[in-house]
Amino acid sequence: MNMPFPSREQVESIRKNYPPDTRIVLNNMNDPYSPVESGTRGTLRYVDDCGQLGVAWDNGRSLSLIPGEDSFRKLTQQEIIQEQGMKVGEMVL
């Protein structure tokens, strides 16, 4: 489906809601050729002028999200704390 090009105001709103380093989890990606698996987490790197979110996925992939096409959400503060705890635990072992 072709999405209309977002206005400058819409892009700025996306940038405000998704600043760099925001942690994201993918619910579903509408890409039949090379989708990222549902449940994959990643870190937002940028929002481009088309309003697409450039994400560095934890599985090593780099594929943008398209708001309105792909389903995703920010990680909750509790999920972020749990991730940080796992990383600390991994370093101790």
Pin down the residues of each PLM region.
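Basic/aromatic-rich interaction segments and small domains that mediate binding to polyanionic partners
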Residues: N2-G85
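Non-Sec secretion/translocation targeting segments of pathogen effectors
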Residues: Q84-L93
